[in-house]
């Protein structure tokens, strides 16, 4: 599959855009959509490799982060409403519960408000 640039929008519960970014579509096997991003990721070190896994029928997505040298860093799991993917744009409503899973399989629950 030729690389396709897409826009991902993380939305608040009221539908307003919290964060938006560009990435490349690397796989689509409904209901799974996989993106890769190599850009500036906010507080994440520039050059970090981010693989993003979204299922159009599930209430979560998973980011797999690698250091710039390719070493696995961690998984980051977002609890969200099932996303939509239409015309090169993926939108999901973030439900503000996140889980970080480290290489030793320990984890930390974040954003419980």
For the regions a protein language model found, what residue spans apply to each?
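Structured beta-strand/loop patches that form or line metal/cofactor-binding pockets in enzymes
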Residues: 53-97
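Charge-rich, low-complexity N-terminal segments
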Residues: 1-49
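Structural beta-strand/beta-sheet cores of well-ordered domains, especially the beta-sheet scaffolds
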Residues: 4, 21, 73-75, 97, ...
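A generic structural motif
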Residues: 9-13, 66, 100
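A hydrophobic, small-residue-rich beta->alpha segment in the mid-to-C-terminal subdomain
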Residues: 95-113
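Short acidic-glycine loop/turn motifs at beta-strand connectors
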Residues: 28-30, 68-69, 102-106
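Well-ordered beta-strand positions
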Residues: 25-27, 54, 100-101
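Short, solvent-exposed aromatic-acidic interface loops
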Residues: 39-42, 81-82, 113
